[in-house]
């Protein structure tokens, strides 16, 4: 079954061609164009010819007065033609650079200059063949769907027919665009045209939309060259005269000069260099070093010679060979800086911290005795009793009074926190373990205990039996500033008590018979207190080196001596 079309009414209707040209122009510019086409594609001429297409009915699904659905086989070989106008880029290097990233191209200057020329293309000798699904309804118009690519061939005539390369390129590109047009855009165009012919509501709404568009577009256009800037320059930065500005217009040439104000250029340059970064949105934050400043010269300018309190620790950690002892050095330096009683300078605390770190490293491998025996070598029973209390003795030999030599404390100064200033003192401290040697000022609380005991003993020498009761009432409390209290106490006892208590204040050989009982009781109490405190520090979890200083931060007083 076949049909014969009356093609003459379509050829006679002028409004149909006008509307079809507008729809084709919008459809050709909607799809992404190749980079060689630098302007919009305009349909200047459209003619459907005098030869109608041939339709063969393959299937009819629905047939009524106001609706129809069927599948057809269409073939067309006629004299229809279509004329297009656009502008193309004649320099292929410019097109190549536009489609490649800037960091991957050599960025030529003269060779990449754009050259645009007008182009007129005429499409004729269409040959179409394909299967079409046609659905007709007076309420919804005509819907046409191509099940395959209907374009077989066409003829492309252009301005560059004399150049074979350009002719073949245009033929290939236009064929690709027309295949997309037939599959996607042409069914939409036919549907809109059918709605305009058979649906009055759609026609009225379209006319109202066109009227609103024309009203908005009325009035003279604004010329950006009417009010040029005060100091205009061209794209190369050359200043322009008033005569040159007056000669410029929007339609004077293909490429209009870009006018920029010199003040705006300076502002853009300052904005580009903002915060010494390439980001235009870098916030302005005071006293902040950006990553673009992290060069040796910029780092020196930013610091200004001021070192933070923790900078010596960083310098010390980087200046030695990495190992397990680095952690001991850092801990000793941090403890010496945080325990300083006055606001000393950073470099002085750094020097003292280095000395403390060397002592802790030298005594790291020598751990022999954990108990310092301060008793007199008089009887054996006393030694047995003290060694029974202590749990830190690590030797298997019989308890001896002289087994642990007394350390020669050579850093007897008024400042209880000051560590040794030179590495010579490490020869005099061989038996102090490293876990208790990290904070050297631990000897000062022991010296204060001995001083208090001597003073209490001197005041109550006639009543040696009531030592425990008096000691409970006179227990020294930990003050908020323990270092200042220790300093005043040491100055008060400077004339009465000797300075080197661990080795000289206790009379061992030339003591008088009248004070032998008092000295013996004092030594026993002092040794028991030291052993008990060291035992508590060993059993306390965490860092045992700083347990004594951690107890100073509590408000509770230490327990009474002898308990």
Swiss-Prot record:
<dbReference type="InterPro" id="IPR031468">
    <property type="entry name" value="SMP_LBD"/>
</dbReference>
<dbReference type="GO" id="GO:0008289">
    <property type="term" value="F:lipid binding"/>
</dbReference>
<comment type="subunit">
    <text>Component of the ER-mitochondria encounter structure (ERMES) or MDM complex, composed of mmm1, mdm10, mdm12 and mdm34.</text>
</comment>
<feature type="region of interest" description="Disordered">
    <location>
        <begin position="537"/>
        <end position="563"/>
    </location>
</feature>
<dbReference type="GO" id="GO:1990456">
    <property type="term" value="P:mitochondrion-endoplasmic reticulum membrane tethering"/>
</dbReference>
<dbReference type="GO" id="GO:0000002">
    <property type="term" value="P:mitochondrial genome maintenance"/>
</dbReference>
<feature type="compositionally biased region" description="Polar residues">
    <location>
        <begin position="387"/>
        <end position="399"/>
    </location>
</feature>
<dbReference type="GO" id="GO:0015914">
    <property type="term" value="P:phospholipid transport"/>
</dbReference>
<dbReference type="GO" id="GO:0032865">
    <property type="term" value="C:ERMES complex"/>
</dbReference>
<keyword id="KW-1000">Mitochondrion outer membrane</keyword>
<keyword id="KW-0813">Transport</keyword>
<feature type="domain" description="SMP-LTD">
    <location>
        <begin position="1"/>
        <end position="195"/>
    </location>
</feature>
<feature type="region of interest" description="Disordered">
    <location>
        <begin position="488"/>
        <end position="517"/>
    </location>
</feature>
<feature type="region of interest" description="Disordered">
    <location>
        <begin position="212"/>
        <end position="237"/>
    </location>
</feature>
<feature type="compositionally biased region" description="Basic and acidic residues">
    <location>
        <begin position="371"/>
        <end position="381"/>
    </location>
</feature>
<keyword id="KW-0445">Lipid transport</keyword>
<keyword id="KW-0812">Transmembrane</keyword>
<comment type="function">
    <text>Component of the ERMES/MDM complex, which serves as a molecular tether to connect the endoplasmic reticulum (ER) and mitochondria. Components of this complex are involved in the control of mitochondrial shape and protein biogenesis, and function in nonvesicular lipid trafficking between the ER and mitochondria. Mdm34 is required for the interaction of the ER-resident membrane protein mmm1 and the outer mitochondrial membrane-resident beta-barrel protein mdm10.</text>
</comment>
<keyword id="KW-1134">Transmembrane beta strand</keyword>
<feature type="region of interest" description="Disordered">
    <location>
        <begin position="336"/>
        <end position="399"/>
    </location>
</feature>
<feature type="compositionally biased region" description="Polar residues">
    <location>
        <begin position="336"/>
        <end position="351"/>
    </location>
</feature>
<dbReference type="InterPro" id="IPR027536">
    <property type="entry name" value="Mdm34"/>
</dbReference>
<protein>
    <recommendedName>
        <fullName>Mitochondrial distribution and morphology protein 34</fullName>
    </recommendedName>
</protein>
<keyword id="KW-0496">Mitochondrion</keyword>
<comment type="similarity">
    <text>Belongs to the MDM34 family.</text>
</comment>
<keyword id="KW-0472">Membrane</keyword>
<keyword id="KW-0446">Lipid-binding</keyword>
<feature type="compositionally biased region" description="Basic residues">
    <location>
        <begin position="358"/>
        <end position="370"/>
    </location>
</feature>
<feature type="region of interest" description="Disordered">
    <location>
        <begin position="411"/>
        <end position="431"/>
    </location>
</feature>
């Amino acid at each position: 079954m076949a049909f014969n079309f009356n093609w003459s009414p379509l050829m006679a209707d002028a409004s149909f061609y006008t509307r079809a040209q507008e729809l084709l122009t919008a459809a050709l510019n909607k799809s992404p164009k190749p980079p060689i086409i630098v302007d919009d594609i305009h349909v200047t001429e459209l003619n459907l010819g005098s030869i109608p297409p041939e339709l063969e009915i393959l299937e009819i699904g629905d047939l009524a007065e106001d609706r129809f659905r069927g599948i057809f086989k269409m073939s067309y070989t006629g004299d229809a033609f279509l004329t297009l106008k656009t502008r193309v880029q004649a320099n292929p290097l410019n097109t190549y650079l536009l489609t490649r990233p800037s960091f991957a191209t050599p960025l030529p200057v003269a060779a990449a200059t754009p050259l645009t020329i007008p182009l007129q293309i005429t499409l004729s000798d269409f040959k179409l063949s394909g299967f079409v699904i046609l659905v007709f309804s007076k309420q919804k118009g005509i819907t046409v769907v191509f099940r395959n690519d209907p374009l077989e061939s066409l003829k492309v005539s252009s301005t560059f027919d004399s150049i074979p390369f350009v002719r073949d390129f245009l033929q290939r590109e236009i064929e690709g665009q027309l295949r997309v047009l037939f599959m996607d855009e042409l069914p939409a165009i036919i549907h809109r045209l059918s709605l305009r012919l058979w649906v009055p509501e759609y026609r009225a709404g379209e006319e109202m939309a066109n009227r609103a568009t024309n009203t908005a577009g009325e009035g003279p256009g604004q010329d950006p060259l009417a009010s040029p800037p005060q100091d205009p320059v061209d794209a190369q930065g050359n200043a322009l005269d008033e005569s040159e500005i007056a000669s410029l217009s929007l339609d004077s040439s293909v490429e209009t000069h870009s006018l920029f104000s010199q003040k705006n250029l300076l502002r853009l340059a300052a904005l580009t260099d903002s915060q010494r970064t390439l980001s235009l949105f870098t916030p302005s934050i005071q006293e902040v070093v950006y990553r673009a400043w992290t060069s040796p010269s910029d780092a020196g300018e930013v610091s200004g010679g001021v070192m933070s309190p923790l900078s010596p620790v960083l310098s010390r950690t980087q200046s030695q060979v990495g190992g397990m002892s680095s952690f001991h050095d850092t801990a000793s330096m941090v403890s010496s800086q945080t325990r300083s009683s006055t606001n000393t300078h950073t470099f002085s605390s750094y020097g003292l911290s280095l000395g403390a770190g060397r002592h802790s490293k030298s005594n790291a491998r020598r751990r022999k005795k954990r108990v310092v025996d301060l008793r007199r070598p008089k009887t054996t029973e006393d030694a047995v009793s003290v060694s029974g209390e202590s749990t830190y003795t690590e030797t298997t030999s019989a308890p001896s009074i002289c087994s642990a030599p007394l350390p020669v404390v050579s850093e007897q100064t008024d400042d209880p926190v000051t560590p040794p200033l030179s590495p010579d003192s490490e020869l005099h401290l061989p038996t102090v373990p490293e876990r208790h040697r990290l904070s050297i000022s631990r000897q000062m609380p022991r010296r204060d205990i001995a001083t208090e005991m001597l003073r209490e003993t001197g005041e109550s020498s006639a009543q040696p039996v009531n030592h425990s009761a008096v000691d409970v009432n006179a227990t020294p409390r930990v003050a908020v500033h323990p270092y200042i209290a220790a300093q005043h106490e040491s100055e008060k006892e400077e004339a009465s008590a000797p300075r080197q208590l661990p080795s000289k204040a206790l009379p061992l050989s030339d003591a008088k018979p009248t004070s032998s009982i008092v000295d013996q009781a004092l030594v026993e109490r002092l040794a028991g207190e030291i052993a008990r405190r060291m035992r508590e520090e060993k059993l306390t979890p965490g860092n045992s080196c700083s347990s004594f200083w951690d107890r100073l931060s509590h408000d509770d007083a230490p327990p009474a001596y002898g308990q």
